[in-house]
């Protein structure tokens, strides 16, 4: 479905500024590799789309100056993007002098939509139709299977995805999924005990069923992309997602860190302390997840409301014990928490900061911040970043 010219906003200065990005100056992930000649065209395509996405509407001449590409290259690429329906001409800039005002171009932000899926909730799978700027336009959810049944989990996910594709009002650019577990870059879920998946080709299977591009990542890795792209995070940080389980995503040098086994950030089953503790679902005693998961903290608080400060302080201390070596080894500047503010904000964060500073080098890591994310729907927005990166080279 296309958008007619009379439905598009006029290309005023206010419109251009507003559309630079819905959440402010989003940033892109940096590449650590040199561009080979045979890859130059793909690099140039991504550079142009990246510039338009983050900077907003501009003329072809502006785009040439901003990217350093020749005007001929820009003209060829823009013509290709317009033919593909990715870029649109949105009017002319207000005249400020003699001569013909330049035509402004931008990503077709209203001409495509993204489907985002979050499988990390304790009782439901969440899904949304999102704009290219990460705004949630429509949302739906389906109950999460009560037991780890891989077939039932996939059936529920597929039904939710199909519903969202049907209610999308523009062509779907792709589907992004944030799922618990260890996920390879090709979208194969190596292990997700909570969903009953082992070596499950989630990305390939759903793509075949929907006939759409699908990208699947660990839910914390999706969340960290959203925090970096749309949030206020630095170039080196960790995001800890606290919900049914506990997991982390890491950005170092403006690049996601996945690890050799694609399990970087799997901190939930690190044993914290030698004083025993609650038994974890994995069978071990004293895993971080057994101390820090939302259900565990809430159960402890319900059992002894008078001990609220002590319970939350202990949880924050255990978390800091687990992450202090990571903060020091990677020289991270901040730790961002995603989860219920009523549990994480205040006492828990204060205890984490105190313990983190006590367990790292004095005078070096004293400015490391621990804070809550200010974003809602962080996994869904991370799913949008995944699709933008995979389909357009935009991140």
Whereabouts are the PLM-identified features?
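ATP-binding/phosphotransfer module of carbohydrate and carboxylate kinases, centering on a glycine-rich
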Residues: 1-141, 147-171, 230-231, 274, ...
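Phosphate-binding/catalytic loop of phosphoryl-transfer enzymes
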Residues: 117, 171-178, 182-283, 287-288, ...
């Amino acid at each position: 479905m296309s958008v007619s010219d009379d439905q598009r906003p006029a290309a005023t200065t206010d419109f251009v500024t507003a559309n630079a990005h819905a959440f402010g100056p989003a940033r892109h992930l940096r590449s650590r590799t040199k561009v080979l000649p045979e890859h130059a065209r793909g690099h140039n395509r991504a550079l142009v789309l990246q510039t338009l996405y983050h900077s907003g509407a501009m003329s072809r001449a502006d785009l040439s100056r901003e990217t350093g590409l020749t005007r001929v290259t820009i003209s060829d690429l823009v013509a290709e993007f317009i033919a593909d329906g990715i870029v649109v001409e949105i009017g002319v800039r207000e005249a400020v002098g003699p001569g013909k005002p330049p035509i402004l171009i931008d990503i077709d932000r209203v001409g495509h939509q993204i489907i985002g899926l979050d499988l990390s909730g304790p009782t439901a799978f969440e899904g949304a139709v999102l704009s290219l700027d990460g705004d949630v336009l429509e949302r739906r959810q389906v109950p999460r299977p009560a037991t780890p049944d891989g077939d039932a989990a996939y059936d529920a996910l597929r039904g939710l995805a199909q519903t969202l594709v049907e209610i999308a009002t523009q062509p779907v650019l792709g589907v992004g999924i944030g799922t618990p577990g260890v996920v390879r870059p090709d979208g194969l879920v190596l292990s997700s005990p909570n969903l009953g998946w082992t070596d499950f080709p989630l990305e390939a299977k759903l793509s075949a069923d929907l006939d759409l591009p699908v990208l699947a990542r660990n839910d914390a890795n999706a969340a960290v992309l959203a925090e970096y792209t749309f949030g206020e995070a630095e170039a080196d940080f960790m995001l800890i997602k606290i919900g049914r389980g506990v997991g982390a995503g890491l950005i170092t040098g403006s690049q996601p860190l996945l690890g050799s086994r694609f399990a970087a950030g799997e901190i939930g089953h690190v044993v914290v302390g030698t004083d025993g503790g609650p038994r974890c679902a994995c069978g071990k005693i004293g895993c971080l997840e057994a101390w820090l998961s939302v259900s565990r903290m809430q159960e402890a608080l319900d059992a002894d409301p008078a001990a609220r400060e002590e319970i939350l302080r202990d949880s924050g201390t255990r978390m800091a014990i687990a992450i202090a070596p990571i903060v020091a080894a990677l020289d991270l500047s901040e730790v961002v928490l995603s989860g219920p503010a009523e549990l994480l904000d205040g006492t828990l964060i204060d205890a984490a900061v105190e313990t983190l500073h006590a367990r790292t080098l004095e005078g070096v890591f004293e400015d490391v911040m621990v804070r809550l994310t200010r974003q809602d729907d962080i996994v869904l927005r991370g799913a949008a970043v995944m699709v933008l990166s995979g389909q357009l080279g935009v991140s």
